[in-house]
From Swiss-Prot:
Residues 473-482 have a biased composition (Polar residues). Disulfide bonds: none annotated. The gene is gefQ. Residues 211-245, 315-384, 483-501, 508-533, 783-864 have a biased composition (Low complexity). One of its GO terms (cellular component) is plasma membrane. Keywords: Coiled coil, Guanine-nucleotide releasing factor. This is Ras guanine nucleotide exchange factor Q. Gene3D superfamilies: Ras guanine-nucleotide exchange factors catalytic domain, Son of sevenless (SoS) protein Chain: S domain 1, Winged helix-like DNA-binding domain superfamily/Winged helix DNA-binding domain. Residues 550-689 form the N-terminal Ras-GEF domain.
C-alpha cells in the first residue's frame, strides 16, 4: 500500500484517543465516524497488510510485531497489483474504498511511529469500552462492543480489554514507506502476547461522501525516499489509473475460511445517504432504546445475535450473484471490496495522496469464483426464521419475496437497515423470558393497514349503489339522494309538476300518468287537463282534507285523503312521501286496514280524488280514457304493495292474517288483472325474505299442515331457501372430492315429507327433481373442478346471495339482492342462503312493450335469524325510473326471466353445472350427495395470536392483551352489528323501549341497549381484574387504542360503550393508574370524549355523521333521544287531521337507521375471541368494591371488630389512626355506640381526595367492612356514589330521556 508523506493533512474526525507517553491528541471535528475493527488471531504468524511487486517478497518474521520499511527502489506502480491480506488471506483484484475511519487509523499509527522514533519506547493506546474498562458479555464473545468515544475500536476478544500496546520497530532505515521493489511492509501488533491482525472494516458500505478527494499528479512516478527516518515515502501513480472515487456500496471482503462462525451480517433498510449520517444516527440519536444501560446510544450487544435472523429475511433465496460487487453473504459482517477507492488528501502544502490502484489481476479470478460458489451454497442452506403473524410483517415479507434481487443489488447507493423491525424482534425475545405475560404482545401504532383492509372488503362485498360506496372511510362526500328526473326530461307535458319532485326519486306513480296512452295527441290532452287541475288545487291550498306547506308538501290531512294521494293520477308524489307513509302508518292505522284500503282502491279505481279529473272525461264520453285511467290507478296500487313487500316485509312476519290476506289478494284480484304482475309480487314476497321471516316467527312450532297451506309445492324458491336453512348441511367426501354444504338424498326426502306432511315419497321425489332440474340444488358429479361453496371454515359465517338474471334486449333489468341467515347450519361452515336464478334475489320487473320498465327496484341485503322472535328492517330501495302500459294493453309484458327464471341461474363461486344436470332425477339414497351453492365472501383475514393456532378452541390459552386490538374491534363490531340488524321500525314506535313491558314488546331493542351497557361494565371488569398496576395500565391503554380503532371503523355505538366504561366512578377514581398513561393517549381519549359528548345536543357527533359513511354502526342513544322528543308532539291535530309533519320527522330518523342496516360489516366470527368479549362482568357494586381493594382512598375507614389491626393494615394498605382502630374494635360494647356513630359521621364529613391527578374526583365511601371470612362488604352512600350515578346516567342516555 502506498502511503504519502503528507498523510498528516488527512482530515481527522473526533479522534479522542487516550494514550500514554507523548502521543498527542488528534483534531476533533465532532464527528464520530472512526471505526477500527480488530480481531484476534491465536497464530504466531504475522498477518499483514502489504503491497507487493512481482520481483521478490521479503517478509519480516520477527517475533516482535513491527513495521518494516525497505527503501531500495523507486518504481512506477501502474503495472502492479495491490493485494490486501486480511486475517492471513489474500483478497485479490479488490479495490479498497476507505472513509475517514481508516484514514484516521492510519494517521494514528503514523503519529505513534513518530513518537516512538523520538522517544524510543513503547506506546500504549488506551481503549475504553462503554465509558469504562469492562469485559464483553460471556454469551456473545464474538459480538463487537462499541466505545462511546472516538475513534470507535471494535474488539472481538474474550478477555478484559484495558489497553492496547503497539510496539513499533524499524528494521531498516527507520522510515515508513512503500517498497515497490518487491519487499513487503509488515504491520504487526502485539496484544498480551497474541498476534493481532488489523482488519479495517466498516459496519456498512461506505457511500460517496466518505471518499476523500484525490489530487492526481500526473507523471509523478518517483517515490520520495530520503535518509530521514520519519518520512513516509510513496509513489503516486495515476497516469493511466481508472480508479473511481464515487463507487457506491464498496465493501471489504473477509476470508470465508477464517472465522466463518460470525453471528452477524449486514443488510436491512435504514436509509442513509452516507456513513457520517449512519454513525450519527446509530451513535448520537437514541433510536434503539437501551434495556440494560440507559446511557448507551448503541444497540446492546445481545442485539447483534438477533441481527443474523433479522437480516436473512431480506435476502431472497433466489438472489443471483453475478459479480463480486453484487455478492451478498448474509452470514458475514464485513463488507465487500468494490471497484476502486482512492484515499487522498488535498492540502496547501502537499499534493500527496493515498491511492489504491485499480488494476485487474486475472490470476485471482478463480479465487473469486470459488468465493461466489461458497456464498451461493450458504444462501441455499440458509433457513428462514419463523415470522410473526402480524399483518405488517406479512406485508413486509411479501414485498421482500417479490423482488428478484437483494436491496444491495437494487440500490447500490442506498443501503437500508430496518432497525425498527430488529428492535421489535429483540424486545420480543427478551420479553418472552423476563417481562410479564401481559407485555408479551406489543400492539402499537395506528393500524391503518388493517383498518383499510376491513372497510375495503366490507365495501367490496356489499351491494350499496356506487354513489353510496364512495362515501366510505376517508371519502367525505356529501350525502347524495337519488334525483332521477328521466321522465320529466323526456315528457315536456309534466314541466309544471317538477316542483313536486324536489330531492325525491321518480316513482312509478309519476311515470304512470305520462307514458301510457294510445296516441300522442290524446296523452297531451289528458295530461294538460290533469296538470291544470293540480295547479289550481295546489295554488289555492284549499284541498278538502289535506294541508300543504310552502314547499307543496303535505303536513296534515285525513287518513283516506293521504292514502288517496298514492292512487290519484292528478298528483305527483315522490318515493320519499311513500316511504314516509309506510314507515309511520302504524300510528294511525293497522296493517290490515291499509291492505283493505288498497284492495278497495284496486277494485274501485274511480273514487275520491280521481273522480275530479274523470268528470271532465265523462262529459266527452271518452270511455277508452276512463279504462286507461283505471289501469293506471291499479298499477299505482301494485306499486305501493310492491314497495311495502320489498322494504317493509317485517309487517308480514308477525301477523298471520295479514300474510294470508296478501297472498289471497295476489292470487285473486292481481292475477285476474295481470297474471304476470301476480307472479312478480309472489316472487317479491320470497325475495324480500318476509316469507322466511314469517315462517321463522310464526310457524316454528306449527304443524306441517299449516306450513303446506302457506307454501305450496310449486313454490320451489321458498322450499329451496327453507331447506338450505333447516336441513343440516355438512362437508362430505366423494372419492377425491370434498363437497361442502352438502346433504344426502334420503335426508332431503325425509325432511320434505315431515315438513309438508306429504302422503307419499313419490311426491317428495318429484318436487326435489324439479329443484334439481331448476339448478336450485346440484348433484355432486356436476360440482366441477372448483367447489368450495362456503366462504370459510369458520364456525359461523354470514353470507349473502347475489346473482343476476339476464334480461331481454327490450327490458331494463333491476337487481334485487336479499340475504337471509339462519343458525341451524353452523356445523356446515356458515349461515347460508341458496343461490340460483329462481331462488336468487335478482329478478326483472314486468316491463312494457316499448322497452321501458314498468316497476323496478333494488332491495339491498338484510339478514335474519330463524331463532329470533321478531324481524328486522329490509333493505334500502333504489327507486324505479318509469312505468306504464303501451299500446293500450292492460297486461304488461314480462320477460321470460320472471315467468321462467329457473334456467338463468348464475353461480358466484362454483362453476355452474352444465345444462345436462336437467336430465338428473333425484335419487333417494344415502350415497347420493347434493349440495347448495353459496357466494364466496371476501372476508378480511383474522389477526390472531400465535397461541391461538396451538389451541384455537381453548379460551384459557389467550387473554385479552394477547389479542390484536384491531381483531378485538372487529369482533366487538360484529357482535353489536348482528343485534343492530335485527331492529325494525316497529321497535321505535311510541317510545316502546321506555315502557314497563318493553322486554316483551321490543326485545330486540332492549337486547341492543343492554349490550351497550354490558360493554361498559366489561371494560371496567377487565381493568379491575388485576391488582398489578402495570397490568391495569396496559389494559387501560389497550382500551384507548381499541376506541381509536372503533372510531375509524365508524362504530360509534361500541365506541361510546367503551368510553362510558372508562368514565365509571370505579375506574375514574384509580388515581395511580391514570397517572401512568402518557399524555398522547390521554389527548386521544379526550378527543373521542368530545366527539361523543352530549354537549349542544351531540353537536360534534351530528357533524361527523352529517356525511354518511358505510359501513357504520351509529350511536343509538342519539336516535332514541330524538324520537323521545318527537313523540311528545300529538299524533292528531285539533281538527282531527293526522299530524303528518310529526310522521315526517319520525320517518327521517327511521330511514337513517335503515340506511345503515343495508351495508354490513363483512367479518369472520371467531368463537374463542367472542367468548372473551362476552365474559362475565361485575355489577356496579362489585366494581366499586374491587376498585377500593386495588387503590384504597386516602382516608380513615371503619374496620370489623374481629379483624386485627395488623391484618387490616396489610390487607387494605390504608392509613388509619390508632384511636379509630381502637374505637372500631369495640363495636361489641353497647357503651361505645355513641362513639362509633360519631366516628362514622366524621368519616362521612371528611373531604374527598384532591382531583388534581385524577380525571374525575373519586367518590367517598361511608364505610368498608372486612368480615371474618376475608370477604369485603361496603356501605355506600347513594348521594356520593359516582359510579351509581354514572350507571343511571348511561341508562338515561340510552333510553333517550331528558
Amino acid at each position: 500500500m502506498d502511503i504519502n508523506n503528507n498523510i498528516d493533512n488527512i482530515t481527522n474526525s473526533n479522534n479522542n484517543i487516550e494514550k500514554n507517553n507523548n502521543i498527542n491528541n488528534f483534531d476533533n471535528n465532532n464527528n464520530n465516524n472512526n471505526i477500527l475493527y480488530i480481531s484476534s488471531s491465536e497464530s504466531n504468524n504475522n498477518n499483514n497488510i502489504n503491497s507487493s511487486n512481482s520481483s521478490s517478497n521479503n517478509t519480516n518474521n520477527s517475533n516482535n510485531s513491527s513495521i518494516s520499511n525497505n527503501n531500495n527502489n523507486n518504481n512506477n506502480n501502474n503495472n502492479n497489483n495491490n493485494n490486501i491480506s486480511i486475517e492471513g488471506n489474500t483478497a485479490n483484484n479488490s479495490d479498497i474504498k476507505v472513509g475517514t475511519s481508516l484514514t484516521n487509523s492510519i494517521k494514528s499509527f503514523k503519529k505513534l511511529f513518530n513518537n516512538q522514533k523520538s522517544n524510543n519506547n513503547n506506546n500504549n493506546l488506551q481503549v475504553n469500552h462503554f465509558q469504562q474498562s469492562q469485559s464483553l458479555p460471556p454469551s456473545s464473545n464474538t459480538s463487537p462492543t462499541f466505545s462511546s468515544t472516538s475513534p470507535i475500536i471494535i474488539v472481538s476478544d474474550n478477555t478484559n480489554i484495558e489497553s492496547l500496546d503497539l510496539e513499533i520497530n524499524s528494521n531498516n532505515s527507520g522510515s515508513i514507506g512503500s517498497n515497490n521493489s518487491g519487499d513487503n511492509n509488515n504491520i504487526n501488533m502485539n496484544y498480551k502476547s497474541k498476534s493481532l491482525s488489523l482488519n479495517y472494516s466498516i459496519l456498512r458500505p461506505l457511500c460517496d461522501t466518505d471518499n476523500i478527494s484525490n489530487n492526481n499528479n500526473n507523471n509523478n512516478n518517483n517515490s520520495n525516499n530520503s535518509n530521514n527516518n520519519n518520512n513516509m515515502s510513496s509513489s503516486d501513480n495515476n497516469n493511466n489509473s481508472n480508479s473511481n472515487n464515487t463507487t457506491n456500496g464498496g465493501q471489504l471482503k473477509r476470508n470465508n475460511s477464517s472465522n466463518n462462525n460470525n453471528r452477524y451480517s449486514i443488510g436491512g433498510p435504514l436509509k442513509m445517504s452516507n456513513s457520517s449520517d449512519f454513525n450519527d444516527y446509530l451513535l448520537n440519536n437514541n433510536i434503539l432504546y437501551n434495556i440494560n444501560q440507559p446511557n448507551r446510544k448503541t444497540p446492546p450487544p445481545n442485539l447483534m445475535s438477533v441481527l443474523k435472523n433479522s437480516f436473512t429475511q431480506y435476502t431472497p433465496p433466489s438472489t443471483t450473484l453475478t459479480s463480486p460487487t453484487s455478492t451478498r453473504n448474509p452470514n458475514r459482517l464485513s463488507t465487500n471490496l468494490s471497484n476502486v477507492t482512492n484515499i487522498s488528501s488535498s492540502t496547501s502544502s502537499s499534493s500527496s495522496s493515498l491511492n489504491a490502484n485499480n488494476n485487474t489481476n486475472n490470476n485471482n479470478q478463480q479465487l473469486q469464483q470459488q468465493q461466489q460458489q461458497q456464498q451461493q451454497q450458504q444462501l441455499q442452506q440458509q433457513q428462514q426464521l419463523t415470522k410473526s403473524y402480524s399483518v405488517s410483517n406479512l406485508m413486509r415479507s411479501q414485498s421482500s419475496s417479490s423482488s428478484s434481487q437483494s436491496p444491495l443489488i437494487q440500490q447500490s447507493d442506498q443501503v437500508t437497515f430496518d432497525y425498527d423491525y430488529i428492535y421489535r424482534r429483540f424486545l420480543r425475545s427478551r420479553s418472552e423470558l423476563t417481562l410479564p405475560s401481559w407485555d408479551n404482545a406489543q400492539y402499537e401504532g395506528d393500524f391503518d393497514t388493517e383498518i383499510q383492509d376491513t372497510l375495503t372488503r366490507a365495501l367490496s362485498n356489499g351491494n350499496l349503489p356506487s354513489d353510496n360506496k364512495r362515501q366510505s372511510l376517508h371519502l367525505s362526500t356529501e350525502s347524495t339522494t337519488s334525483n332521477n328526473n328521466n321522465n320529466n326530461n323526456n315528457n315536456n307535458n309534466n314541466n309544471n309538476n317538477n316542483n313536486n319532485n324536489k330531492s325525491k326519486t321518480d316513482d312509478t306513480t309519476n311515470s304512470a300518468t305520462t307514458t301510457t296512452t294510445t296516441t300522442t295527441t290524446t296523452t297531451t290532452t289528458t295530461t294538460t287537463n290533469s296538470t291544470t287541475t293540480t295547479t289550481q288545487l295546489n295554488n289555492g291550498k284549499n284541498l278538502i282534507g289535506l294541508v300543504y306547506n310552502d314547499k307543496d308538501e303535505v303536513i296534515a290531512g285525513e287518513r283516506d285523503k293521504i292514502i288517496g294521494l298514492f292512487t290519484d293520477i292528478s298528483k305527483v308524489t315522490g318515493t320519499q312521501f311513500l316511504e314516509e307513509f309506510l314507515f309511520t302508518y302504524h300510528y294511525y292505522m293497522t296493517s290490515v286496514d291499509l291492505l283493505e284500503n288498497l284492495k278497495g282502491r284496486f277494485n274501485n279505481p274511480l273514487m275520491d280524488q280521481a273522480a275530479q279529473s274523470i268528470s271532465i272525461l265523462e262529459e266527452n264520453h271518452d270511455k277508452v280514457k276512463i279504462e286507461q285511467l283505471s289501469t293506471h290507478i291499479r298499477l299505482r296500487v301494485i306499486n305501493v304493495i310492491k314497495k311495502w313487500i320489498e322494504n317493509h316485509g317485517y309487517a308480514f312476519a308477525t301477523d298471520i292474517n295479514l300474510y294470508q290476506m296478501l297472498v289471497d289478494f295476489i292470487d285473486g284480484d292481481v292475477m285476474s288483472f295481470s297474471q304476470r304482475w301476480g307472479q312478480y309480487l309472489k316472487k317479491a314476497i320470497n325475495d324480500s325474505g318476509c316469507l322466511l321471516r314469517y315462517i321463522a316467527v310464526n310457524v316454528k312450532e306449527a304443524s306441517s299442515k299449516q306450513l303446506r297451506e302457506i307454501i305450496s309445492l310449486d313454490n320451489l324458491d321458498a322450499i329451496s331457501k327453507l331447506m338450505s336453512q333447516s336441513l343440516q348441511l355438512k362437508e362430505r367426501k366423494k372419492g377425491l372430492k370434498v363437497i361442502k354444504n352438502s346433504f344426502t338424498g334420503n335426508e332431503a326426502v325425509e325432511w320434505l315429507i315431515n315438513k309438508f306432511n306429504l302422503d307419499s315419497k313419490d311426491e317428495a321425489l318429484e318436487t326435489l327433481s324439479k329443484m334439481l332440474q331448476s339448478n336450485l340444488i346440484f348433484h355432486h358429479s356436476k360440482s366441477g373442478s372448483s367447489f368450495s361453496p362456503s366462504s370459510s371454515s369458520s364456525s359461523t359465517t354470514t353470507t349473502t346471495t347475489t346473482s343476476s338474471s339476464s334480461s331481454s334486449s327490450n327490458t331494463t333489468t333491476a337487481n334485487m339482492a336479499s340475504s337471509s341467515s339462519a343458525t341451524d347450519n353452523s356445523s356446515s361452515g356458515g349461515v347460508v342462503t341458496s343461490s340460483s336464478s329462481s331462488s336468487s334475489s335478482s329478478s326483472s320487473s314486468p316491463s312494457n312493450g316499448n322497452g321501458t320498465t314498468a316497476i323496478t327496484s333494488t332491495s339491498l341485503p338484510n339478514s335474519i335469524s330463524s331463532s329470533n322472535s321478531t324481524s328486522i328492517l329490509t333493505s334500502l330501495v333504489v327507486n324505479s325510473n318509469s312505468s306504464g302500459i303501451a299500446n293500450g294493453s292492460s297486461t304488461p309484458s314480462i320477460p321470460s326471466s320472471v315467468t321462467s327464471p329457473l334456467t338463468n341461474s348464475k353461480s358466484t363461486l362454483n362453476s355452474t353445472p352444465s345444462s345436462s344436470s336437467n336430465s338428473f332425477t333425484f335419487k333417494d339414497k344415502s350415497t347420493s350427495i347434493y349440495y347448495f351453492i353459496f357466494e364466496n365472501i371476501n372476508f378480511p383475514e383474522p389477526i390472531v395470536p400465535k397461541t391461538f393456532f396451538s389451541s384455537p378452541n381453548s379460551t384459557f390459552s389467550i387473554t385479552f392483551l394477547d389479542i390484536h386490538p384491531v381483531e378485538i374491534a372487529r369482533q366487538l363490531t360484529l357482535i353489536d352489528y348482528e343485534l343492530f340488524k335485527k331492529l325494525s321500525p316497529t321497535d321505535f314506535y311510541h317510545t316502546a323501549w321506555s315502557k314497563p313491558d318493553a322486554k316483551e314488546k321490543v326485545p330486540n331493542l332492549i337486547n341492543f341497549i343492554n349490550r351497550s351497557n354490558t360493554v361498559s361494565y366489561w371494560v371496567a371488569t377487565e381493568i379491575l381484574s388485576s391488582s398489578n398496576i402495570k397490568h391495569r395500565v396496559s389494559v387501560l391503554k389497550r382500551f384507548i387504542t381499541i376506541a381509536e380503532i372503533l372510531r375509524k371503523f365508524h362504530n360509534w355505538n361500541t365506541l361510546t360503550g367503551i368510553l362510558m366504561g372508562l368514565n365509571l366512578g370505579s375506574i375514574q377514581r384509580l388515581k395511580k393508574t391514570w397517572e401512568s398513561i402518557d399524555k398522547k393517549q390521554l389527548d386521544s381519549l379526550q378527543n373521542l370524549i368530545n366527539l361523543t359528548s352530549e354537549r349542544l345536543n351531540y353537536s360534534n357527533y351530528r357533524k361527523e355523521m352529517s356525511t354518511p359513511t358505510y359501513p357504520c354502526l351509529p350511536f343509538m342513544a342519539v336516535y332514541l333521544k330524538d324520537l323521545y322528543f318527537i313523540e311528545e308532539n300529538p299524533d292528531y291535530l285539533e281538527n282531527g287531521y293526522i299530524n303528518f309533519e310529526k310522521m315526517k320527522m319520525i320517518s327521517k330518523v327511521l330511514i337513517e337507521i335503515k340506511r345503515y342496516q343495508t351495508e354490513q360489516y363483512w367479518l369472520k366470527k371467531i368463537d374463542a375471541i367472542e367468548n372473551i368479549l362476552k365474559s362475565v362482568v361485575l355489577t356496579d357494586k362489585d366494581l366499586y368494591k374491587a376498585s377500593h381493594m386495588i387503590e384504597q382512598p386516602q382516608r380513615t375507614m371503619t374496620v370489623g371488630s374481629n379483624l386485627k389491626a395488623q391484618s387490616f393494615l396489610t390487607t387494605t394498605t390504608t392509613t388509619t389512626t390508632t384511636n379509630n382502630l381502637n374505637n372500631n374494635n369495640n363495636n361489641n360494647n353497647p357503651n361505645n355506640n355513641n362513639n362509633n356513630n360519631n366516628n362514622s359521621a366524621n368519616n362521612k364529613s371528611s373531604p374527598s381526595p384532591s382531583p388534581s391527578s385524577s380525571p374525575i374526583t373519586s367518590s367517598p365511601i361511608s364505610s368498608l367492612t372486612i368480615n371474618n371470612n376475608n370477604t369485603i362488604s361496603s356501605n355506600l352512600s347513594a348521594s356520593t356514589d359516582s359510579s351509581i350515578n354514572t350507571k343511571k346516567k348511561s341508562s338515561f342516555l340510552m333510553f333517550g330521556k331528558k
